[in-house]
Amino acid sequence: MSANHHQQFFQKMKELSSQYHFLATNKATIALADLSLLNDLRPKNKLPALLAQKLSTTETQKLAHFTYKKRYTEWLGGRLAAKYCFELFLGKVNKQPLAPNTFSILADEHGRPYLEKTTYRPLSLSISHSKGYAAAYVSPKQSCGIDIQQITSKMEVVAEKFTNHSEKALFHDPKNQLRNLTMIWAAKEAVKKSLLHDQSITFSATNVIEIKKTGSNTWKLQCNVIGSPLPLTTVKIATFNDFIIGCTEGESYA
């Protein structure tokens, strides 16, 4: 495909990110990318210049290790979304922009992304992807978490593993059970990434205790988090086509 096609990837990412900017609090930022616009890429082929110029040498080397197309596209799309999200963050806090190929977004020992070789700290970063979309969140707080999840019937099959009757009863529209279950899942995944990233426990440590509808397609879920320095946290939720996006943040720096 032509450079114009890949330019559409960045243009659509800009549009989607602007559309869902309300999910980010205070000085935080969010980015959302459509990975279908990268479908022409193949792991063994040379990365087009328009995309390659966004990656550092370290990231380019990391990308070369992915031989499975789906994982290749998700990793690349996630990094491109995160770098755009960081660009938005710098603009929000009135800092000079950085060339995206001058710093790396790597993963720590728990798999959580972080910025390497940049003085723009403290901040936290989270990345998620699901069925052709990637999402990123950058926050000035100690931690943050974002999750994007497609609404599918799989949620009913695994519901007992991540939720209970009390949480499901908080919703007053049982006709939307798949959506409701996906909201609970996304909320708990976002909390895990933000507050429980270094723990083996996942869903059992987070209990949804309150759900408040804030708009036609937006909600706030209040969660009790066991074993966290922030035992009570809020997850902002929005629907996006047949997807759910959930975002949360941890404590502020002292």
Predicted regions and their residues:
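Core catalytic alpha/beta fold that binds nucleotide/phospho-ligands
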Residues: 1-254
